[in-house]
Amino acid sequence: KTDFDGTMKALVDIGYKRMEAAGYRDGKFYGKSPAEMKKYLADLGARMVGSHTGSGLLAEGDTKGWDFWKKNAADTAEVGCKWIVQAGYPSKDIKSLSDVKRLADQFNKCGEIAKANGLRFAFHNHVDEFHELEGKIPFDVMIENTDKGLVTFQIDTAQLVYGGFKCHDYVNRYPGRFANWHLKDANADGKGSTEMGAGIVDFKSIFGVAEKAGLED
C-alpha cells in the first residue's frame, strides 16, 4: 500500500512474473488504465494473467450491474489477462437455495461475457459458501448449476480447509471443474494462513489430482 512500485519490482526480482490483480476500480487497475498497466508490467518483465473482481447477486433487469461486467471484461482483456475471477461469495445477498441457483445463472452469463472477450471466468472460494443451506452446500450447488464450458472454479486450498473440506475430495467429486488454483496453507487451528509446508494442507495429495482437476494455472 505504501510502495507499489518497490513491491512490484521485488516480486519480479524473486521470480514472480505472472501476476493476478485484486484492484480493479472505476475502469482502472491500481489507478492505472488497462493500457498503462499492461505497459507498466511489460517494462518490469511481467504480465497480468488474472484479475479478482466481482459483484453481488444482481437483480432481474439490473442493466448497471451487467454494464459493469461488460466493461470489466473488456478492460481485463485489454490488460492481457486470461482469467477474470469473481473473488468471493455474496453471502449477504443469499437467503435461500433459490438465490444460490440465481447466482449460478449469473455466473453462466458472466462466463458468456468473458468468453466474448477472449477470457475465462472463474469463481474463487472462501468459507461462507461451505455453510449448509437448506440441507445443501452452496458451493456444490454452484458447481452443479454452472456450465463447465463457461465457468470454472479457482480453488483456494486454505479456505477449503477453513470450510471443513479438502481439495482432493472436491476434485474427485467434480473432475475437470478446477482449472485455476490459489495455493495457500492453513494453520493447525484452521483459522489463519501460514507459509506453504508449515500448515495442515496436504499439498502432496493436491498435486496428485492436478490433472483430474483440469488445472491450467
Regions found by a protein language model. Give the residues of each.
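Stable alpha-helical elements in mature extracytoplasmic
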Residues: F4-T7, S33, M37, W69-N72, ...
